[in-house]
Curated annotation (Swiss-Prot):
Protein name: Translation initiation factor 5A
Organism for this UniProt entry: Caldivirga maquilingensis (strain ATCC 700844 / DSM 13496 / JCM 10307 / IC-167)
Cellular component GO terms held in the UniProt record: cytoplasm
Gene name for this UniProt entry: eIF5A
Gene Ontology molecular function: ribosome binding; RNA binding; translation elongation factor activity; translation initiation factor activity
HAMAP family: eIF_5A
Lineage: Archaea, Thermoproteota, Thermoprotei, Thermoproteales, Thermoproteaceae
GO terms (BP aspect): positive regulation of translational elongation; positive regulation of translational termination
Length: 132
């Protein structure tokens, strides 16, 4: 699981952060003003990249948050079974399986053996994002 740290005040909409140990794409950021006895807070709302679940985190703007390192690579579909897809990584020719729940909706109908797909490896999770 490769991550780096960033300040919560520097997070923008469209970026990616880890919320509850799941990689999420940030869809909303609200920053409150500094109070009389406290620091400014950031309310960050994200949608899970892997599972699509909406998650919220409230942290001080100077707090460090984890930002996942997203590795994108091309793979070829070898076979499709009922609940998983077997792929071959075109960089090193290793085979691996991805559950059907980790396939983006727009790519589900286009999968067949021999098709090349773009795979995202985020925090140890692999997900098929689109066909090539």
């Amino acid at each position: 699981m490769s991550t780096r740290t960033a300040s919560a005040g520097d997070i923008k909409e469209g970026s990616y952060i880890m919320i509850d140990n799941m990689p999420c794409r940030v869809v909303e950021v609200e920053k409150s003003k500094t109070g009389k006895h406290g620091s400014a807070k950031a309310r960050i709302v994200g949608i899970g990249v892997i599972d699509g679940v909406k998650r919220t985190i409230v942290v001080p703007t100077d707090a460090a948050v984890e930002v996942p390192v997203i590795e994108k690579f091309t793979a070829q579909v070898i076979s499709i079974s009922g609940d998983s897809v077997q792929l071959m990584d075109l960089r090193n020719y290793q085979t691996f399986e991805i559950p059907s729940s980790y396939i983006e909706d727009e790519a589900k109908g286009k999968l067949e053996p021999g098709v090349q797909v773009e795979v995202w490896d985020v925090a140890g999770y692999k997900k098929i994002m689109r066909t090539r």
